[in-house]
Amino acid sequence: MAANNMVNPAVDPALEDELFAKEVEEVKKWWSDSRWRQTKRPFTAEQIVSKRGNLKIEYASNAQAKKLWKILEDRFAKRDASYTYGCLEPTMVTQMAKYLDTVYVSGWQSSSTASSSDEPGPDLADYPYTTVPNKVGHLFMAQLFHDRKQRQERLSVPKDQREKLANIDYLRPIVADADTGHGGLTAVMKLTKLFIEKGAAGIHIEDQAPGTKKCGHMAGKVLVPIQEHINRLVAIRAQADIMGSDLLCIARTDAEAATLITTTIDPRDHAFILGCTNPDLEPLADLMMKAEAEGKTGAQLQAIEDDWLAKADLKRFDEAVLDVIAKGKFSNAKDLAAKYQAAVKGKQISNREARAIARQLLGQEIFFDWESPRTREGYYRLKGGCDCSINRAISYAPYCDAIWMESKLPDYAQAEEFAKGVHAVWPEQKLAYNLSPSFNWKTAMGRDDQETYIRRLAKLGYCWQFITLAGLHTTALISDQFAKAYSKIGMRAYGELVQEPEIDNGVDVVKHQKWSGATYVDELQKMVTGGVSSTAAMGKGVTEDQFH
C-alpha cells in the first residue's frame, strides 16, 4: 500500500517557538503605541498570540478603527466633537458621507427594521445576535462599492479635469451597537469577532443584564455588577487583539435611571443598593407568595407591593446613616455626618466596611436590609443617578476607549457633572453622548440652545455624539409627507417633494442608475470584452440622459 503523502509534515518545535516569540514581540510593540496609553489588559501578549491561527488575516476593521481613533483623538484634544446619527441603509450612508465623518448603526433601528429573523420588535435585544453585525456588513459593503465606483470615475477623467468631480470619503468609520453582548463572555467574543469581520471601527456595550435588556429610555432596567461589565469590556479587547484590530470599545452605563441590579457581589455597587429601614416588615417576596396562595392577582398584588414599599422606607445605606444621625439625639450631629461622609464618599467601600464606620461613629447598629425588598425575580433594588454612573464609569475607564452615560433628558448640568466626575480621576477619558430622539427637544430647550448643544457638550469632553434613530425618523417623515401628498395630487407630489429638490440640491441619487454603479459595471464589462459591449446599461437610449 502506498504511503499517505497527505499527512501534515512534522513541525519543527524550535521554529514554531521562534515564530511564536517573534509574534509576541510584535504584539508587545503594538501595545506600546500611545493609542493604548490608558488601556489596561489583564492578559499577556503570549496568551493572545497562542489563541491565533497560523494564517494571518488583515481585517478592514483595523484600518477603520485607526481612522476613528484619529478622529476622536483630534476632537477630544480640541474639545470638539464628531457627530453622526443612526444609518438605516446604503442610500443613507452615501449621503451621510458627504457631511459627517462617522456612521452609527443602532440596535434599536435594527430591531425594528432589519432583524435577521425578519420579525420586527422593540429594542429588547431579543433579535438574533447576527442582526447588527449584518447591518454593519450591509453598510460597509456599500461604502466599499461607492468608493470603488468614485475612484473609477475620477481616474477615467484627465487629471486637470478631476477637480470638477466629487471626491467624497465614503469610508466613514462605523460604530455599532453590541447591546449587552447577547450572553456570556464567549458570546461577547463571538459577537465582537462578527463586528470586526463585517468592518466595524468601534462598538459600544452596556451594563444591563442580557435577559432583561431594555432601550435606554424604557423602564425596568436591570444592571449587572461592575466586575461583570468589566469582564465584557476585557472580552472585547481580547478578541480584537486576537484578530489584530484596533477596534474601539465604548462602555455604556445605564445606571442613571436603573432601578434594579442582579446581585450584591461587587462591593463597588454597595453604596447604591436600596435597603428596607423598617424592621417590622416581613420580606416582600414572602408576602407576595402568601397573597398569590390566597388567590389574589393583578391589581391586588400590585397594591400589596405598593403598600409594602411605602412602609419599607427604602434608602441607600449612606442615606440611612445620615437619617439616623439627623433624627437622633446627637449633640454633634453635624460633625458626625461630615465625618461619616468623608470616610465613605467616593471610596467604593463595601457595605460591611460602611457599617463598621457607622458603628464606630454612632455607637449603634443601623438597621438596613437589602434582602427583604428583593423582587419576585430575585433582583435587588437600586437607586441609580449621576453619582452611580460616575462610580461605574471610573471603574470602566481603564478597559474602554470612551464612556457613555445614558440619560433621561438632554440635561447639560448633568452632563457636566458626569464629565467632571470622570475627569477628576481619568482626565484623558473620552466621552460619548446620545442626542436621543426619545427626548422632546422642543420642550427641553430653545432653538438657540439646540444649535449650540453639541458644541457645549464637546467642551466637556464629549468628543463623539450621535442621534441614535435619526435615520428611522427622517425616513418616516419623508415617507409620510410623500405618501400623503401623492395620494392627493399624484405625480405633482413626486416632482415637487422629491425630484425637483434633488436636482436643486445636487443630490446624486437623482441619477439613480449612475448612483447605483451602472457606469462602473459597464466599465467592468468592457474591460472583459475588450472595450466594446452592445449591452452596456448606460449606452444609447438610457433615460438618465434627460438629467444632463
From Swiss-Prot:
Induction remark: By acetate.
BP-aspect Gene Ontology terms: glyoxylate cycle; tricarboxylic acid cycle
Record SUPFAM superfamilies: Phosphoenolpyruvate/pyruvate domain
Annotated residues for binding of substrate: S106, G107, W108, G216, H217, R252, N434, L435, S436, P437, S438, T468
Enzyme class of the recorded protein, top EC level: lyase
Compartments in which it is found: Glyoxysome
Protein name per Swiss-Prot or TrEMBL: Isocitrate lyase
Natural source organism: Neurospora crassa (strain ATCC 24698 / 74-OR23-1A / CBS 708.71 / DSM 1257 / FGSC 987)
